[in-house]
Amino acid sequence: MPTNLELKARTDNQSIAAVLQRLKARDLGLVKQTDTYFVFRPGRLKLREMNSSRSELIWYQRPNSHHRRYSNFKRIPVKDPQSLKNILASSIGVKAVVKKKRRVYLFKNARIHIDAVENLGTFIEFEVMVTKGRVQAQDLLSFLRRAFNVKSRSILVTSYCDLINRLRKKPK
């Protein structure tokens, strides 16, 4: 099963573009994503619809932690996302819908995401693919955290889904 080492943080860092350029990170483009999270345990289950053309069902499991968030995941392509969404919504329920614009970069064996999430703000996320061992993944994540000056107070321990649900529950 594939594994990533992940870190997600709030950002308003104006120097992100300069850091990406200095690292020579490869720009893979902008993707509009709608993630529909379903009521599911263990782990999380979401249907990701991208740029109105590609979709995939993703299951993942990871701890809510500041440090060493390893995520085990499985994903499959989906040809008819609307039908699958209707079936899952009817059978197990929808937990939240997260809409975002994601700029994706690649640096070594890490994906760097700059996410503009509807109603939440801007975030940076590192997904280090654990393909060269855990020590290398931890070292690369630490390097990226320093390079982008990610402070501990800005690190998120939950998913966008949890943040959206908290926002919905706040009294107006």
Question: Where are the regions that the model predicts?
Answer:
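Conserved, surface-exposed functional patches that form binding/active-site neighborhoods
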Residues: 96-132
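N-terminal strand-loop-strand beta-hairpin
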Residues: 1-109, 148-172
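Glyoxalase I/VOC metalloenzyme domain signal
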Residues: 2, 17-19, 123-124, 135-144
